[in-house]
């Protein structure tokens, strides 16, 4: 596989709230990745409707997991990276995102993650992002150094998800440049073998 071959990126949205704003950011990022020639698959907990975690995917007998988990496992195994779109609820990670993440483990290994975070206020979700970094490292998909933080998301993105200002666009492009670099680098390294 060439160094510049298109990547497969799973874009995990972390909100199921009514009138959620994160869907605009998720669609923006999916579109931006596709414009770069990559396959970007939106994983939306509003559509998937996973149950609250009582058994991880790996704890089901082979072929016995619910269809939704089998589909996600298949996507995650072929993914080159994970881009998380997270709100900040009470200074923390949204429960829908944590539930979505916790159903899997080995499927994430040796792949980078990137965090796009947002809020209605001025902090842009960064407090949730700091918690996510610890979680993602433990799940085996360390996050890249940069964040794509969107403060005042209702003002920053139009209804169709397009940025209303140049700063947001520039920040997103730089963030995606960095994420691509890590995804290509770790894909090369996975191809040559993993520690276990």
Please place each PLM-identified region on the residue numbering.
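N-terminal beta1-alpha1-beta2 submodule of the flavodoxin-like/Rossmannoid cofactor-binding fold
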Residues: 1-99, 106, 162-196
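A short small-residue
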Residues: 5-11, 112, 151-160
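Glycine-rich, flexible loop/turn motifs
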Residues: 48-49, 56, 65, 104, ...
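Short, surface-exposed connector motifs at secondary-structure boundaries
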Residues: 80-82, 111-114
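A glycine- and small-aliphatic-rich helix-loop capping segment at beta-alpha/alpha-beta transitions
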Residues: 99-107, 134-138
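Short, glycine-/small-residue-rich phosphate/pyrophosphate-handling segment
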Residues: 112-153, 166-170
């Amino acid at each position: 596989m060439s160094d510049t071959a298109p990547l497969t990126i799973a874009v995990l949205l972390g909100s199921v709230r009514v009138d959620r704003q994160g869907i605009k950011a998720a669609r923006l990022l999916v579109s931006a990745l596709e414009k770069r020639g990559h396959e970007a698959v939106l994983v939306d907990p509003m559509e998937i409707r996973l149950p609250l975690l009582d058994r991880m995917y790996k704890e089901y007998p082979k072929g016995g997991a619910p269809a939704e988990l089998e589909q996600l496992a298949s996507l995650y195994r072929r993914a080159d990276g994970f881009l998380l779109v997270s709100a900040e609820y009470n200074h923390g990670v949204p429960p829908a995102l944590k539930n979505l993440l916790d159903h899997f483990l080995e499927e994430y290994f040796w792949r980078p993650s990137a965090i796009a975070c947002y809020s209605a206020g001025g902090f842009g979700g960064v407090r949730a992002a700091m918690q996510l970094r610890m979680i993602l490292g433990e799940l085996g998909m360390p996050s890249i150094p940069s964040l794509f933080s969107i403060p005042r998301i209702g003002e920053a993105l139009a209804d169709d998800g397009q940025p209303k200002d140049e700063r947001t666009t520039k920040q997103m492009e730089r963030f995606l440049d960095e994420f691509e670099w890590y995804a290509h680098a770790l894909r090369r390294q996975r191809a040559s073998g993993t520690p276990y």
